[in-house]
Amino acid sequence: QMDATMKAPTDAFVKQLTDGPNTKGVGNQLLAPTIQPDGTKQFDLKAEVTDWEIEPGKIVKAWTYNGTVPGPTIKVQPGDKVRIVLDNQLPESTVIHFHGLTVPNAMDGVPDITQPPVRPGKKFSYEFVAQGPAVGMYHSHDFAEHQVPDGLLGAFLVGDEPVPAGVAVSQEIPMILN
C-alpha cells in the first residue's frame, strides 16, 4: 500500500502525463499501420524534438518518434510485408536499426555501412518481410550516444510468443532495456 502522502501527488502526475502537455501522447502504444494496395503494412515514424515533462515542472527536450518516449510499439504478423517510413525532422541525421528481427542487410540501419544517414528533412523507407515470432526493438544508430538516451527507441513485435500451458496472460506490457 502506497503511503497516502505519496499517492495523491503521484496520481496527479500520472494523470498529467497521460492527459497533459508532456509529450504528444503516451509512449509504447500500438501504432496502427496504413495498409497499402499490395497488402504492405506501412508504419510512419517522424523523428522530432519534443518538450517532455519528466517530473513535475521539469521539462527537457526529448528526441522522439511520433512525439512520444518511448516511440510507438509496432506489431505485425510473421509473413507480413512491412514498410517503416522514417521522416527525419531532427536537427541532424538519423537512421533506424532493428534488434531481435531478421531484416535484409540493406535495411539494417547502420549509417554509412548498410545505408546512408537520413539527413534532416529527408525520408527513408525500410522494407522487409516479418519473420517470427519475435520480440524486438528499434532505435537510432546514428549519433546513438545521445539520440537513444534522449528517446529514439521503441518496441517491435512479430506475432505472439508462445505462452506455457496453464499460464494465463492478463496484460502484455513491452519493456525496452536499452
Where are these regions (language model features)?
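Intrinsically disordered, low-complexity terminal tails/loops enriched in metal-binding residues
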Residues: 1-51
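Feature targets compositionally biased, intrinsically disordered low-complexity regions
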Residues: 24-26, 38, 56, 66, ...
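Histidine- and aromatic-enriched segments that form or immediately flank copper-ligand environments
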Residues: 42-158
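Extracellular interdomain linker/stem segments of modular secreted and single-pass surface proteins
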Residues: 159-163
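Acidic-aromatic/histidine active-site loop/patch
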Residues: 171-178
